[in-house]
């Protein structure tokens, strides 16, 4: 599926691009973004690029989708989540979500999930 997204490539380097999302894995979910809020945290990430604590150092080679305050609708659910979620259900992303021991978070750190996109892949 194609998505259109605002992607960060580095300091003050944002690009609106259309590209193909990968097929979802069994532990992922394809979703449509309905609304995204912009805030100073996104601005800070765009200005600082790879110097931002949540933006990966290799962002120039692996751009990330900006936007961490968003909601939408589930489109396709991987088999791992089929008993919990269904296509058509609404979702929202907790904006400070990250795993213990890492600062990686949607809207800062990942290639296929961020609020400034039409469609995204929600990872496990």
Model-derived regions: residue spans:
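Glycine-rich beta-strand-centered segment in the early N-terminal region that forms part
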Residues: 22-36, 51-100, 114
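Short, compositionally biased
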Residues: 104-118
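Short helix- or helix-capping micro-motifs
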Residues: 122-123
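Extreme N-terminal starter segment of soluble prokaryotic enzymes
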Residues: 2-4
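Extracellular beta-rich ligand/substrate-recognition surface
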Residues: 7-13
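Short glycine/threonine/proline-enriched tight-turn/helix- or strand-capping micro-motif at secondary-structure
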Residues: 13-20
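Short Gly/aromatic-enriched secondary-structure transition segments
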Residues: 44-52
């Amino acid at each position: 599926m194609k998505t259109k997204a605002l992607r960060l490539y580095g300091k003050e380097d944002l690009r609106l691009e259309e590209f193909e999302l990968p097929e979802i894995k069994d532990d992922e979910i394809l979703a449509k973004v309905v609304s995204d809020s912009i805030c100073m945290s996104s601005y800070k990430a765009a200005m600082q690029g790879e110097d931002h604590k949540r933006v990966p150092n290799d962002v120039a080679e692996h751009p990330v989708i900006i936007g961490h305050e968003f909601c939408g609708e589930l489109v396709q659910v991987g088999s791992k989540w089929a008993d919990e979620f269904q296509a058509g259900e609404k979702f929202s992303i907790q904006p400070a979500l990250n795993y213990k021991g890492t600062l990686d978070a949607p809207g800062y750190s990942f290639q296929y999930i961020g609020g400034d996109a039409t469609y995204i892949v929600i990872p496990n």
